[in-house]
Amino acid sequence: MADDRVAGGATPPPPPPPPPLDASAFTHTPYYCEENVHLLCKELIRSGISDPAGTDLYAVFISNEEKKVPLWYQKASHSGDGFVLWDYHVICIQSRRKNGEVLDLVWDLDSSLPFPCSFIQYVSDAIRPLSFGNSTYRRLFRVIHAPVFLRSFASDRSHMKDHAGNWIQLPPKYESIVAEDGTTNNLNEYITMSMDDVKDLESMADDVYSSKHGVVINETILPEFFSRLPG
C-alpha cells in the first residue's frame, strides 16, 4: 500500500480549494436556506461541478434543542465579524476523494467566506467548534446524503407565516418543494434534533447513505466525520 505521508512522517496538506464562484449566479431567497440548498445541489449536479448523481454532496442542517445557532461570516449580520444567531441554518458540503487526496468544500450562499470554501476554513471561521462548551448554544449537524435529500425533502413554507397567515419573510417565486412520495411538508423533521440523536461515529458513517433524515453529529465529531466517508 502506498505511503501517503511526506518526509518526516508529516501528513501532506489538503489540496487547495477551486477558485471561488459567483454566488449570485445561483438561486437564493433570503431566509429560505433549506430551499436554497435543495436547488444548489441540483445545480451543482446539472453543471457538472459535482458527481452526476450527486453522491459527493451532503445537505447539512445546523440547529440545536433551543433553536439558537451562532455562526460567523454571515451576510445577514450587522456586526463586523458577521455574527448571526440563527434558529437553524442549512449548508451544502461536497466531499471528494481523488488520487488519495481529500477535498471537502462548503457551499454556503449566506456566507461572506469564499464560495465554495474549504471545509477546514469554514469550520474554523464560521462555526468555531466548542466555542460554547456544553451551553445551550452548542451546535448539532444533521447530515443527509444529497440523493436522499433531493428525493425526500418537502416544505410548504408554513413556518414563514404568522398566526394571521401573513408572510414573515417573502417566499421564493417558484413552486414549493414536494417530495417524491407526495409529502408536502417535513421541514421540522430535519431541523429538530437533540444530543440523544448522536450515535457512534462508525455507524453514522454508514447510516448517512440510507437514512431519510440522515444522521446527527455534534461539534466534537464534525471535524472528523467527513474524513471517515468513503468518498
From Swiss-Prot:
Disulfide bonds: none annotated. Residues 11-21 have a biased composition (Pro residues). One of its GO terms (molecular function) is protein-N-terminal asparagine amidohydrolase activity. Residues 1-21 are annotated as: Disordered. GO terms for cellular component: cytosol; nucleus. It catalyses: N-terminal L-glutaminyl-[protein] + H2O = N-terminal L-glutamyl-[protein] + NH4(+). Pfam families: Nt_Gln_amidase. One of its GO terms (biological process) is positive regulation of camalexin biosynthetic process. Its EC number is 3.5.1.122. It comes from the Eukaryota. Keywords: Hydrolase. Mediates the side-chain deamidation of N-terminal glutamine residues to glutamate, an important step in N-end rule pathway of protein degradation. Conversion of the resulting N-terminal glutamine to glutamate renders the protein susceptible to arginylation, polyubiquitination and degradation as specified by the N-end rule. Does not act on substrates with internal or C-terminal glutamine and does not act on non-glutamine residues in any position. Belongs to the NTAQ1 family. Monomer. This is Protein N-terminal glutamine amidohydrolase.
